[in-house]
């Protein structure tokens, strides 16, 4: 285990925010987690776990031990004629894992193709797209519990998965995820909930065709971080009450929405942002992408403060126009490497 000091993280966050941590270590073996924790304690440092850097807002400098989870490997734990359970290490690239599973006839994750990041980050936000969430297929999560100071296994039920939510987000900073298992299907049950996806896939739908369709849609709508640094979808789709939606629909009858199990309505945040005039609009080096209003882009040398100023203005404008609160998705880090709550713009 080799610790590096004053390590530049600019290339390790997809928004390309200039950032430097006091201490950094890249781990390829989960057995090195405990030595890394001992190092942090001995030096009075908090621990910040870095995965793919795709859902992060980093400060220019922070005092913490950044543990970069780069473990690799996959193995089949069990299988039968209908299902397969695959254990995958946290450092594997998410999109590569999804594509490999589909190619081998292990299905369920196709709608989540091309989401940036590594596998270990999938349970934290319970990543989701086009009607599918990772938590639906996660069976077990292996992690180190910093509170109990021991390795643990959590079932999907214990993970408390919700919309862009989990126990790992609720108790941020407590768990270091190093592996997880997915229960996937050998007979594809395609999710074609979204009209755009269903139309493109067509009647002769297959898992491979669905996978390629999702990839094509995301490539057309979303900027690649290498060209336009971004953190993916920046705001959660707000879930509002039936009365709130009724008020919205009275003025905007074509507002995109999705019925929830509890009678609530999920409204498309990108549509709200577009209607408020923010699609393609910029404040200095920060703006919302011209082809997808939900994606915030660093067009130059933006700082964390520039990003915060922009998204807080968007929150204010949306609330004033629709009386709906938008919540940012990315994790915000403070100067001590701790996950910090976003300051409300309302």
Question: Where is each model-derived feature located?
Answer:
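Beta-rich strand-turn-strand
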Residues: 106, 304-307
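Anion-binding (especially nucleotide phosphate/pyrophosphate-binding) glycine-rich loop
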Residues: 2-141, 145-147
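Phosphate/pyrophosphate- and phosphate-bearing ligand-binding catalytic cores of soluble enzymes
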Residues: 4-5, 10-14, 56, 151-305, ...
């Amino acid at each position: 285990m080799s610790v590096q000091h004053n390590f530049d993280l600019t290339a390790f966050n997809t928004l390309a925010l200039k950032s430097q941590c006091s201490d950094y270590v890249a781990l390829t073996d989960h057995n090195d987690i405990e030595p890394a924790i001992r190092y942090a304690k001995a030096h009075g440092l908090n621990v910040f776990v870095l995965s793919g850097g795709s859902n992060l807002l980093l400060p220019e400098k922070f005092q913490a031990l950044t543990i970069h989870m780069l473990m690799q490997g996959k193995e089949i734990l069990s299988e039968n004629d209908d299902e397969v359970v695959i254990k995958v290490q946290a450092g594997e690239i998410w999109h590569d894992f999804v594509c490999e599973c589909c190619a081998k006839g292990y299905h369920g994750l196709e709608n989540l193709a091309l989401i940036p990041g590594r596998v270990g980050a999938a349970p934290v936000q319970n990543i989701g797209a086009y009607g599918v969430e990772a938590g639906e297929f996660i069976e077990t999560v292996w992690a180190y519990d910093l509170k109990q100071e021991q390795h643990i296994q959590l079932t999907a039920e214990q993970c408390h998965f919700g919309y862009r939510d989990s126990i790992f987000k609720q108790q941020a900073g407590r768990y270091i995820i190093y592996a997880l298992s997915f229960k996937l299907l050998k007979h594809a049950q395609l999710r074609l909930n979204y009209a755009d996806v269903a139309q493109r896939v067509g009647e002769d739908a297959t898992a491979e065709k669905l996978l390629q369709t999702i990839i094509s849609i995301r490539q057309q709508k979303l900027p690649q971080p290498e060209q336009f640094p971004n953190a993916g979808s920046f705001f959660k789709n707000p879930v509002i009450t039936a009365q709130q939606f009724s008020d919205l629909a009275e003025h905007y009858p074509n507002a995109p929405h999705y019925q929830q199990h509890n009678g609530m309505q999920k409204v498309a945040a990108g549509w709200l942002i577009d209607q408020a005039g923010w699609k393609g609009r910029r404040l200095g080096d920060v703006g919302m992408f011209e082809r997808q209003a939900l994606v915030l882009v660093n067009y130059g040398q933006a700082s964390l403060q520039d990003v915060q100023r922009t998204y807080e203005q968007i929150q204010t404008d949306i609330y004033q126009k629709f009386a709906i609160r938008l919540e940012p998705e990315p994790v915000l880090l403070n100067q001590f490497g701790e996950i910090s709550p976003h300051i409300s713009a309302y």
